C-alpha cells in the first residue's frame, strides 16, 4: 500500500484561507490517480475524528464534495498531547509501525519542516509546501516519484 500523510493547511489551501482550494484538490487527485495511494490525515483536522465530531467516512464525504476522487482517506494519526511530546514525524512513524498492511512507499505533504517538533525522524520523505502557496505541480511530481520509487529501506 502507498500512503500520503496529508496536512491540509498550507497544502490544500494557504494559511490566509481556511477553505480547501479546488485547484489543490485537482493536484492531489493527480497523485492519487497516478499512484493508487491512500491518505492518512496528519492535519489538525484529525482532532474532529478523535473528539467524535466527525468520522473517517464523514471526512471522505467532505473531501468528495470538494472534488477528491475515490474516497481515499483511510485513517488519521494519533492526537498529540502535552504529555506525549511527540513530533508529527514521530506520530507518523508510530502509525507506520502499527499498520497491519504492508507499506510499499509513503510521502508526507506538509508545510512543516523536519525540525524536532516538525517531521523528524521521517523528514527525508517530506515534500514541503510553501504555506502561502500550497501544493504545486512540481511538488506533485516529486510526491509521485517518492511513491513510485521509494527511498529504501523504509523506516519501519
Predicted regions and their residues:
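C-terminal cap/substrate-recognition subdomain and adjoining C-terminal extension
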Residues: 58, 62-156
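Hydrophobic/aromatic side chains embedded in well-ordered alpha-helices
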Residues: 1-3, 104-105
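Alpha-helical substrate-recognition element adjacent to the catalytic core
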Residues: 2-83
